[in-house]
From Swiss-Prot:
Gene Ontology CC entries for this record: cytoplasm
Protein name as catalogued: Arginine--tRNA ligase
The keyword ATP-binding is annotated on this UniProt entry: yes
Protein source organism: Korarchaeum cryptofilum (strain OPF8)
Gene name of this polypeptide: argS
EC number from the UniProt entry: 6.1.1.19
Principal location: cytoplasm
GO molecular-function term, one example from the UniProt record: ATP binding
Chain location of the short sequence motif 'HIGH' region per the record: 129-139
Keywords assigned by UniProt, alphabetized: Aminoacyl-tRNA synthetase, ATP-binding, Cytoplasm, Ligase, Nucleotide-binding, Protein biosynthesis
Length: 632
């Protein structure tokens, strides 16, 4: 059975029209995306054939459409019944009964739109938060987007590996390690990532105070950082023992660890593994898991950074300033077509920008990979990681889910990948904006943030209060509704827009929320349970009201929405679809008795419709990671 009946209608209709146009000598071609439903006719789909080919055929639009119609072979078009020309359009009428039956059967079995396995392995790298403080709500958005996009790819037929890059070799971890080295005797309290977050914040504050005193930081005042020290000191007085940290103290630890020397290895690993355990606990609570945690340190120790440097040196665009290595992206863009593609510029564009003195606004000239002391920057290890993904793991493509503030750095990484001989188009930046938790200010360096754990706990408390008001309380239900609410709140906005996170919207049980969708799914499930089964045999022609037909049409569009979410890198499209379908189903249920339908034939058809809604909503929920509930 075709797993996307509507897609089959559109593609075969466009293909057949194109075949006829070739025979008629017209160069005009149509794509499936141009096939649209004829207004007020649920069973007809049209193409503006007459208007597009009138000039080619030297006919008026009406006559051109009829000329094409006369040559159409209906047997080549999926689900076709007949066709007709009207007002310059060529319209296809489908076999409603067969089309509706297949749609409902596929949706009920949760096979609608599911892709055949492609035998192609891809990767989605997401979350990859620095292991220095607890995950905050912005990291949560990254995780939810990355997890959902992985699910979409898998549903469409790709074999997807979910990876997390553990950034254990950066300056932030070195600051945390320097602070921890002063209080090695202290045993972590509470959730371990929260505890290390306090050490990081106070250690960073002590370092900033040292920088100000020694003339390395003129933008901050000692009082600002002293307030951070005092605030955290009131929470954990023992951490005041850390005291001032110097730049050299921190950088010495970082150099040691990157070189795998001294006692730093054990301490860095203890810290990062501990924080990572806290991350995993939070993310698994949200139903988010990974296939691999790749460590930045091992990219250095196992030689991947050296391989990357060798390849970049071979390209001729790697330059050095003492121990600092960088790629000259201006020269690379002038000399390498694939680098120009990364920045979406032609040779003429680059020449023009250079003449106008504006090239630096579009391409940073020096893309540094190491610091002046030779330690690796995150850009250097990111370049090495990209090489490892393709040469080490052998993936065919990789999506990096990284915040929009890293747009230029990601272009630099992709440009380096091109210079190392790989297609930069295979490394895709899935960019997203941040989360504004209305009424809260956040700064990890100052220890001011709303953790993902806190948001989850608050969501659960609020759900408990709402459900208790309704005379319902169940621990598992509260947890799953809270998770659904949070995840929908983070994913229902297009990645290129800032999320304005408001509790009143996130927990709205009436519309446009995770709980609203969960409730609609549970309602459909319970109808099926009460019916004690769904009749295998039913007459699709019994579904004739506008509400019933609208639902079938919406269900038929599910595969199209999934492909749109993939092509546009927008999981929010599926979230919006789930909300629309839930809303339409609720309207249907208000006016259409199912279990008490007037006739057995009507009851059978409506039960199949409800079962299809359940299956489609369930698939949509799975793709955006919202838990299914059997009761609510």
């Amino acid at each position: 059975m075709i797993k996307d009946p509507l897609g089959a209608v559109k593609s075969t209709f466009a293909e057949e029209v194109n075949r006829v146009l070739r025979d008629l000598g017209s160069a005009t071609r149509f794509s499936p995306i141009q096939v649209s439903r004829v207004r007020k006719d649920y069973a007809s789909y049209g193409l503006p054939v007459g208007f597009k080919v009138a000039k080619d055929l030297n006919l008026d639009p009406e006559r051109a459409a009829k000329t094409v119609l006369d040559r159409i072979d209906m047997s080549r078009i999926a689900y076709s019944s007949d066709a007709y020309a009207e007002s310059g359009y060529l319209n296809l009428r489908i076999d409603k009964a067969r089309f509706f039956r297949d749609i409902l059967k596929l949706a009920s079995s949760e096979e609608l739109g599911r892709g055949e396995r492609k035998g192609v392995v891809g990767m989605v790298e997401h979350t990859s938060a620095n292991p220095v403080h607890p995950l905050h709500v912005g990291s949560g958005r990254n995780a939810v987007i990355g997890d959902s996009f992985s699910r979409i790819l898998n549903f469409l037929g790709w074999d997807v590996r979910r990876h997390y890059l553990v950034n254990d070799c950066n300056l932030q971890v070195a600051i945390l390690a320097a602070g921890r080295s002063k209080v090695r005797d202290l045993i972590p309290k509470g959730k371990v990532d929260h505890w290390f977050g306090l050490i990081y914040a106070i250690s960073n504050a002590f370092l900033e105070i040292w920088r100000i005193k020694n003339g390395f930081n003129s933008e901050s005042k000692i009082e600002e950082w002293s307030e951070v020290v005092e605030r955290i000191g009131r929470m954990e007085p023992e951490l005041l023992r850390i005291g001032e940290l110097s730049e050299e103290e921190v950088m010495s630890l970082l150099r040691e660890y990157q070189r795998k020397e001294g006692g730093s290895v054990q301490m860095f690993r203890e810290i990062t593994e501990s924080v990572l355990r806290g991350f995993v606990e939070t993310l698994e609570r949200m139903g988010i898991t990974y296939d691999s945690f790749d460590r930045e340190s091992e990219l250095i120790w196992d030689g991947w950074v050296d391989r990357a440097i060798e390849k970049l040196e071979s390209s001729g665009y790697l330059k050095r300033e003492g121990k600092a290595a960088y790629v000259d992206l201006w020269e690379a863009a002038k000399g390498d077509e694939n680098v120009r593609k990364v920045f979406e510029l032609s040779e003429d564009d680059i020449s023009k920008l250079e003449r106008e003195g504006k090239l630096g606004e579009v391409i940073p000239r020096k893309f540094y990979l190491t610091r002046s002391d030779g330690t690796w920057l995150y850009t250097g290890t990111d370049v090495a990681y990209s090489l490892y993904k393709f040469d080490g793991l052998g993936v065919s493509f990789c999506y990096n889910v990284i915040a929009s503030e890293q747009n230029m750095e990601q272009k630099g990484v992709r440009a380096c990948l091109a210079l190392m001989g790989h297609d930069p188009g295979k490394l895709i930046h899935l960019s997203y904006e941040m989360v504004n938790l209305v009424g809260a200010a956040m700064s990890g360096r100052r220890g001011l943030y709303i953790t993902l754990d806190e948001v989850l706990d608050e969501a659960k408390r609020r759900v408990e209060a709402i459900l208790k008001e309704r005379g319902i309380y169940d621990e598992e239900i509260c947890e799953k509704v809270a998770i659904g609410a949070l995840k929908y709140g983070l994913i229902s906005v297009s990645p290129n827009k800032v999320v304005q996170f408001r509790w009143e919207r996130v927990l709205n049980l009436e519309e446009n929320s995770g709980p609203f969708i969960q409730y609609a799914y549970t309602r459909a499930l319970n109808i099926i349970k009460k019916a004690q089964g769904v009749p295998e045999d039913f007459d699709p022609n019994e579904l004739k009201s506008d509400a019933e037909i609208t639902i079938v049409q919406m269900i038929s569009e599910f595969p199209e929405r999934v492909w749109s979410a993939f092509n546009l890198m927008r999981p929010d499209i599926i979230a919006s679809y789930a909300n629309e379908l839930a809303s339409q189903f609720n309207k249907f249920y208000e006016d259409h008795p199912v279990l008490s339908a007037a006739r057995p034939e009507e009851r059978a058809a409506r039960l199949n419709l409800v079962n299809a809604v359940k299956g489609t909503l369930g698939l949509a929920m799975d793709l955006i990671g919202i838990p299914r509930l059997e009761r609510m």
